[in-house]
């Protein structure tokens, strides 16, 4: 017999009051006694924590908190621990005698939440001699020890041989190990299972009837019929999948054309782009190689051009330097010519202006005299006109007013006085005291003559003054000329210096006359010198180009050698041209052949693709058209054989399906009529009674009952007789057995068991021998075993049938493919490979291109040598005529000598040119420098004295003139007499007025005419002075300009300057012509270099871009290729025939396919998005992703259970035939999968009956349990009325509700829920879906109601409630219920655990002192009978004679709490007999 596992001990480490304490647990009852706060609850809490380390469930409270929903924040665990590492460990030994230590490491977490950290662990293989406290503590000294952390504990255990340490991160894993090793009774898979286990332990700990358990007894006691539910779920899943597959088939049938279109267009879209990129990659590689070759060639050309450019640039620099000198000389010669011409023009202007000045000087002197005379006459006329005007005014005034006339007389008297005053002034000025008015006229003539004499004398002195001034001016002019030529000097030295300057001027003129001959001689020598230098330069350049120095004597021989080389190179170039033409002709022929092969290649590739596909499909290699036709005949024969085998397998599969359906009938009935007869007779099928028989016993019982194993067991045969009359709907042989279905046994037969057989003695004269069947079908286990084997066989047959069907279809498809191949490609498929020939021709073409390139290089070198030879000959042609110049060494010295002489002559010419005019002017007037006219000042004084005398004479004459004019006023002495004769006076006044006016008019006209004449004279004088001053100033400016020019303006200077300029111009023109030639050549060379540089840069840029593009494309292409190979679509995309299309054709093909695809995937969001992303030309891998997505989409649409292939293209080819076959097969399968409502009702009823029988067996173990007034405890199981009605309708009236169960839109669960709602419209289903309700209705537990009843005193059987029982009675009743639950769990889990393990049983009971002695004894007896361990706690030892008792006393020493523990084993002898009514309990419990 299997021994039950036991808990050996409980170890607490570092708990409150327990530092390191191990409690050895009794095999039955362990009692913890002690006062309040002694540590009993802490000990039990440690046990529970090690058993269920789930902080979400643990809540340790005292009995006053029982049933409360909230408690202290730490759930009672934090306060029971000490600071630091704590342990709680359970030492167990299981049925296999394996020692297992399980436990938890606990540690308080700092914080106000008072949390605790828990780590579960397990130790296996620990020797019995090692105590748990030794593992987790380390002794420091005699009175100190240290608790080991978990990692040190792990290291310590790993060091021990044979010991296994496991730390768990999941409570599920921890409980799974405990279940497998037999420590707990049930596998706790989820938090819900742990919660049930904890509620059971909690109910046991605190005692009483737990409402949490009694309310959900179904979950605790009734096992979940997962097999039935899974069967229904599998059936519904199969039906759902079947219907979905049928729907998919219908959709696939409707989308078949779309599939073809989609795969065709997707292949065209992606393959065209794929091959275009492949072609572009090859083209880019070819371009990159071509760019690299061109780059190398261009670099060589650029280097040659650079060498050529350097040579020409050097020569151009030399010519530029020479041109600069020539330009400077030419510019100087031109400037000199311009200066000479300007000086000549200036000299002509000076001579012309000097003549004009002499003429103006004469005219100016004459005009001065005329103006002086006119001024004198003007003054006289002004005096006369003024006197006449005064006279007229007086007379007019007198005539105007007579009174005024009187006044005039008075005035005349005044005038008389004035006349007397004037006479006196004249006497004084003229020094004539005897002067009278009458003699004044005579004296006036005398003094006028005197005035005229003084005027003549003044004019004579003025003329002398002018002549002296002229002499003084000539001296100053000559003196200034000498100062201008020689510089400042004394006036007395002017004569000597002037003579010296005149002699020096003669010498300088003689030297200046030699300038032109010297200049001509120098020009001739300089020309020869330049030719000599040019010849030397040409020779040096030639030597540099030839890379060797040559003597003058070697040049003629070298000239002949170069001409011979030119002739030979010309012949070589001509021969190379003919060879190049031959190579190019061969290249063109190769190109033409390649083009023709490329046109034939796509047709051949298409034939090869078709041939390769056929070879891949059939696994054969075809070398000729005869092989193809022969294989086609073999294919037809194979197709016929496969069809025959497929039909045979299909028949066997149908037979297996029928047997599975027959064995799957509920209750083991192979005939549905037996179930109806059993219900009609009120009996039970014998197969249902033995439905739980084990697989090992099935052969025995099958042979025992033989043909009667399908009998119906009825309580009374006599009551069945009336039903047998007229019974027709039944099997041919119907067996009826009388017996109690609840307690039926096999005692109805007399049986002798033999080896694999039985002999059944039916009667004294009738025996039956039956062998054990090889495949027993009696009992659920046997049927399930047989069904399982049949399912396996059916799977094999289905797979074989599908394989054969696929082979048939494959063969048919191959036949069609061969037919198409023969019709389309057989003529060209076995021809030679055009691509291989193309590769050979391309290799030859590359060789030709390389030969052409080498030939071009050689020809280029010969051309360069030819050009170099021609340049050498040209250079020698220029050098050879100048050999005599190259031999003249004294030419440079002669040039220097002539240049020095020319410098002296030019210096003399510059002196003559600068001072020639001054010397010419000085030469005629040099004699005036001999004496200096000093009397000029005395003459100026005499002239001033004569002017004063002339003014005095003029005043005297004027005074006498005034006396003469006032001569009439002397007659005013008789003005008194004239007053009496006023009339006569008036006439006289009128006459006098007329005379006076006539005189005034004459005076005015004379004054006006003379004033106009004077004005004209003054204007002429001013004009002459202005002209004279202007021309004088211009003459001075011209003389200064001529001096500034510094050029001698002789007659031959202009001609010499012009000749020199023309010579330099000719030299400059020649130099410029050569320079222009060099510049053009250099510009052409630079342009060629620029073109080569730009070409080189472009080539470098193109090469690097192309290289980068190739590298980038390579990375992208590698990604594309990797994606293509990973997804296995290379065969579809790498269409070699597309490689011969142009990029535009491929792009057009891809664009057309893209347009068609946009329409095709318009309704598919995923494909539409992927297609839109694939349109990016920079991301070719996205097109592959689209193609893969299309394939994946097709794979999803064409399911593998319909079409067994991974290739959608092949699937489309198969689809036409396969879909119709699958439609028929799936339709029949759906009919087979569907389960009837009556079968469901029978299954649920049988399950309910089985569980009722099991509960009844459990009740038998509790019938004699008594606590106080409670005499017995039992579980009452009833079927709910609403659910019972549902079962009745399912079994009897299901035809009325076939609209629900035959609907394709509803699953069976949904139809069951709809039926339940139809039968119970008053029940509110809430928010639950029909599927959820239907799944609940398929669980038999929802059909049952369970409650606990007690037989208490006189009340009889009543519902067990805490309010109707005492505390002790409630504790005992609750403990009984818990024992029942534990036993039920063990029964349920027996099939999940090993057969050799019986799990530990342990419950708790706190505050057990509330039970009386009889109840305590009952508990002890219950533990002994059920082999259960019990831990109880009480203030005192309630039964010291049994079990093991621990006395706990909490003590405080030096602020440290410590629980003192004393253990005591029971000393009572074994009871002589068990409790009344419990003798059969162990057998029943087991």
UniProtKB/Swiss-Prot annotation:
UniProt keyword Nucleotide-binding, yes or no: yes
Family matches, as SUPFAM superfamilies: P-loop containing nucleoside triphosphate hydrolases (SSF52540)
Principal location: cytoplasm
Keywords: ATP-binding, Cell cycle, Cell division, Chromosome partition, Coiled coil, Cytoplasm, DNA condensation, DNA-binding, Nucleotide-binding
GO BP term, pick one: chromosome condensation
Stored InterPro entries: MukB, MukB/SMC, MukB_hinge, MukB_hinge_sf, MukB_N_dom, P-loop_NTPase
Annotated ATP binding sites: 34-41
Molecular-function GO term, any one: DNA binding
Subcellular location: Cytoplasm, Nucleoid
Annotated GO CC locations: cytoplasm; nucleoid
Chain segments annotated as coiled-coil in the UniProt record: 326-418, 444-480, 509-603, 835-923, 977-1115, 1209-1266
Entry note about domains: The hinge domain, which separates the large intramolecular coiled coil regions, allows the homodimerization, forming a V-shaped homodimer.
Function: Plays a central role in chromosome condensation, segregation and cell cycle progression. Functions as a homodimer, which is essential for chromosome partition. Involved in negative DNA supercoiling in vivo, and by this means organize and compact chromosomes. May achieve or facilitate chromosome segregation by condensation DNA from both sides of a centrally located replisome during cell division.
Assembly behavior: Homodimerization via its hinge domain. Binds to DNA via its C-terminal region. Interacts, and probably forms a ternary complex, with MukE and MukF via its C-terminal region. The complex formation is stimulated by calcium or magnesium. Interacts with tubulin-related protein FtsZ.
The family this protein is said to belong to: Belongs to the SMC family. MukB subfamily.
Annotated protein name in UniProt: Chromosome partition protein MukB
Gene behind the chain: mukB
